[in-house]
Amino acid sequence: PHLLFLGDIKNPLDAKTAMGVLEWRPEHCIGQFRLPGCEIDLGLPDLSPAAALEAGARSLLIGVAPLGGEIAPEWMESIRLSLASGLSIVSGLHQRLTAVSGLKSIADAKQLALIDVRVAPDIHQVATGRKRTGKRLLTVGTDCCVGKKYTALAVCKALAKQGVDVTFRATGQTGIMISGSGIPVDAVVSDFVPGVCEYLTPDAGENHWDIIEGQGSLFHPAYAAVTLGLLHGSQPDL
């Protein structure tokens, strides 16, 4: 179970990781940890790391997804406090916990884990464009944060309820935290994004559906490259 860290954020869009995990895995969420000035409330109990540990939490999950994916300096005291209190740290940010000076030594001394979710696998696979068996659906949108992940999860849940052979394929950090597997495609070297998407959605049975979490938008000047790589690599039927 997690203590969801919200820092001092004011924009609800910045809390999309915490909101996503709470929506789809509420049983994994013990409480929220907010700093002064935070204007986001998930409706969970406000807990200190020590109180969360006592309530059953085993990790502090950084529930914030700021532009650029950096750990704000003002969060570091809370992260260190969480480690000192006995909580492992889970992060979906680009900046790795293991690269932050001093964190690993604290975690090692307490026998705790620093879990960086947004790390690309060591897969240097160039896309072939070969048509694969099985069926695929890729969620797309006109912007970031418009519901591509939620839609993919909802479609997957509905199909599974009807007995369809279906798999949710996470391509972002929050989707991976929710489903327990996937590849954070925005951490992959650009040459290999389509190939990694082929790897993520391999040959499957004739009636099997892969529901693929979309990223960004073709209209977005910053993230369209990831979107296009997903489109080429997933070869969606829908």
Stretches with model-predicted labels:
Residues L61-A65, S91, I212:
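Redox-cofactor binding/interface segments in oxidoreductases and associated redox assembly factors
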Residues H124-F168:
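Walker A (P-loop) phosphate-binding motif
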Residues V90-H94, L138-V146, I183-V188:
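Flexible, glycine/proline-enriched loop segments at strand-loop-helix junctions
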Residues E39-E54, P66-M76:
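Glycine-rich, highly charged phosphate/nucleotide-binding loops
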Residues R58-S59, S88, W209, L238:
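Structural motif
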Residues S78-R136:
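Extreme N-terminal, non-catalytic leader segments
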Residues P1, I9-N11, A15-L35, P45-A50, ...:
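ATP-dependent carboxylate-amine ligase catalytic core
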